[in-house]
Amino acid sequence: MLKLILIRHGETQGNKLKRYIGKRTDEPLCPEAGNMLAQLAYPEVQAVYASPMIRCTQTAGILFPGKKLNIIDELAECDFGEFENKNYQELDGNEHYQSWIDSGGLLPFPGGESREEFKRRNVTG
């Protein structure tokens, strides 16, 4: 039986600042993230697939050194649209952000993807 293990990338500077870091912001891992990831142990795998984002390829390379990395564009993170690379403090007072919050995150990101579009793209990959 095929077993699929999904792993989120290690921490980036934008993550530390609680920013919406998605498809439009290609930033590397923080130095300490690499050290933390290197201490983790994962089972032997047959194949490694990753988003083309540098933080994802770095994470895969640290966790599975020596394994061929298969890049799948459709696995890239969500397109946060006008929220990209901003945190909740910077979005305070933004009517689109407040509408999105009030919807429980169900509305599409303004200028970005909806949850359904993001899911469909990832599943296609």
What are these regions, as identified by a protein language model?
Residues 63-121:
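Phosphate-handling substructures
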Residues 2-4, 8-67:
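Active-site-proximal alpha-helix that buttresses catalytic centers in soluble enzyme cores
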Residues 39, 124-125:
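Solvent-exposed, charged/polar functional surfaces in cytosolic regulatory/catalytic domains
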Residues 55-58, 95, 124:
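Short Gly/charged-rich anion-binding patches and loops
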